[in-house]
């Protein structure tokens, strides 16, 4: 037994890795005590398996590729849309086969020219701008060469700025003339009062007649004269007023 225990004791420390630290007694399965070193090990707990990302498909085309969300962490981003044949440079009339409708409604020749509707517009507006290089496209592609010096305008260009001499039209003659304002010296009536009814010619004649009769009355004239005499006596300018005052003193 001692031989077997010695064999087991010799084989056990060899399997344990050596680590720095104080020696300790390790019990064996046979009950023999051998000198060895302690071993510290932390148990590892297995966690949940990580999700496997979906495989990227190499073939993506059309609307499915534009609507399918991108795989991976950049899920907000979307793939670029495919190239479209319909751009701003495409002629929509030819694209939608509307040549017949365009020629039907827009290709009719009018009997009257454009100058009949715009007589005051200078220049030859009946001819297209491509003939005399006055169109907007020709001005953009081939801008006119201008020097540093100013050249006077031609007679055709001056017609747009020229004022035609002649009398003013009737509707514009009295625009700058303001009518004279009547001065109203009468007292303004209050807004609460009702407006007086208009006077008839018979009422005005009756008032004038009554006023004339009052002026022709002899007693009325005599009373007026007496009032004037009394006023003149009491006034300081009257010559008799000073003598009467001195006599009283």
Swiss-Prot record:
Keywords: Activator, Nucleus, Transcription, Transcription regulation. The keyword Transcription applies. Component of the Mediator complex. Component of the Mediator complex, a coactivator involved in the regulated transcription of nearly all RNA polymerase II-dependent genes. Mediator functions as a bridge to convey information from gene-specific regulatory proteins to the basal RNA polymerase II transcription machinery. Mediator is recruited to promoters by direct interactions with regulatory proteins and serves as a scaffold for the assembly of a functional preinitiation complex with RNA polymerase II and the general transcription factors. Its main location: nucleus. Residues 45-56 have a biased composition (Pro residues). Residues 179-190, 221-233 have a biased composition (Basic residues). GO terms for molecular function: transcription coregulator activity. The gene is med19. GO terms for biological process: regulation of transcription by RNA polymerase II. InterPro entries: Mediator_Med19_met. This is Mediator of RNA polymerase II transcription subunit 19. It comes from the Eukaryota. Belongs to the Mediator complex subunit 19 family. Residues 9-18 have a biased composition (Low complexity). It is found in: Nucleus. The keyword Nucleus applies.
């Amino acid at each position: 037994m001692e031989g077997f225990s010695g064999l087991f004791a010799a084989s056990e420390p060899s399997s344990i890795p050596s680590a720095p630290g104080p020696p300790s007694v390790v019990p064996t399965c046979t009950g023999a005590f051998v000198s060895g070193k302690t071993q510290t090990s932390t148990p590892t707990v297995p966690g949940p398996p990580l999700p496997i990302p979906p495989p990227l498909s190499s073939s993506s085309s059309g609307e499915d590729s534009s609507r399918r969300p991108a795989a991976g962490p950049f899920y907000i981003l979307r793939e670029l849309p495919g190239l479209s044949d319909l751009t701003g440079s495409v002629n929509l009339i030819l694209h939608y086969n509307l040549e017949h409708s365009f020629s039907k409604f827009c290709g009719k020749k009018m009997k009257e020219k454009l100058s009949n509707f715009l007589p005051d517009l200078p220049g030859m507006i009946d001819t297209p701008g491509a003939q005399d290089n006055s169109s907007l496209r020709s001005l953009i592609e081939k801008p006119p060469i201008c020097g540093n010096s100013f050249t006077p305008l031609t007679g055709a260009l001056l017609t747009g700025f020229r004022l035609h001499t002649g009398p003013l039209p009737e509707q514009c003659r009295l625009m700058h003339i303001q009518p004279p304002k009547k001065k109203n010296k009468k007292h303004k009536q209050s807004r609460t009062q009702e407006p007086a009814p208009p006077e008839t010619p018979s009422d005005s004649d009756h008032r004038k007649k009554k006023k004339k009769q009052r002026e022709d009355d002899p007693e009325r004239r005599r009373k007026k004269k007496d009032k004037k005499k009394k006023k003149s006596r009491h006034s300081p300018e009257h010559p008799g007023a000073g003598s009467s005052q001195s006599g009283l003193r």
